[in-house]
Amino acid sequence: DYINRRAGRVLEIGVGTGLSLDRYATHLQVTGIDVSADMLDKARRKVAERKLAHVVRISEMDARTLAFPDGHFDTVVAMHVISVVPEPEKVMEEMARVCKPGGEVLIVGHFARDKGFLAALERLFAPLANVIGWHSDFELGRILGVRSLEVIRTMPMPPFGIFTFLIQRKAEAARAAA
């Protein structure tokens, strides 16, 4: 719902089979990228079958080297992918680069807790979780180092606050250069 209150161009990193594409409001112009050609074929079929005219492009692309100009998107989204991509810090830099000044970078993911019983469980099971691609020990701080992005809000999400919704705003050009 938050994304649908935004306007303009949206880039979804790790769009996969397009699970979220029909949930975007029709006033948005959505581009989805992923590294899996097979998953993108399914996403393209979904766009065609459901006549999702607001989805303007589906492309095979590595999020570490986005083939878009600086400041091209009003909103850049990564749902449940930032902890599993190679070089997440580089991905964040690229997301910030293609986001317009004043635009937002939105992340949904699981981030390790730093204290409490659940934090201890995450650390205990991290080796097993990593084998299946779930990085329960991935720390939020790893992706907060992009100078041009300011954290606006973090919110726990269902179920049980396991996931976090992170909202970052890209600084206006003059502030980002400072």
Task: Please give the residue ranges for each predicted region.
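A short glycine-rich, Lys/Arg-flanked "PGG" loop and its adjoining helix->strand segment in the class I
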Residues: E89-P101
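C-terminal lobe and adjacent flexible extensions of AdoMet/dcAdoMet transferase-like proteins
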Residues: F165-A178
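Short glycine-centered segments of the SAM/dcSAM-binding site in methyltransferase folds
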Residues: Q29, G102-E104
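Class I SAM-dependent methyltransferase SAM/SAH-binding core
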Residues: L11-I13, T17-T65
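A short SAM/SAH-binding and catalytic strip from SAM-dependent methyltransferases
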Residues: T75-E87
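Conserved alpha-helix/loop element of class I SAM-dependent methyltransferases that forms part
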Residues: D1-R9, L19
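A short acidic, Gly/Pro-enriched loop at the edge of an enzyme's catalytic core
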Residues: R64-V76
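C-terminal alpha-helical "lid/dimerization" subdomain adjacent to the S-adenosyl-L-methionine
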Residues: L106-T164
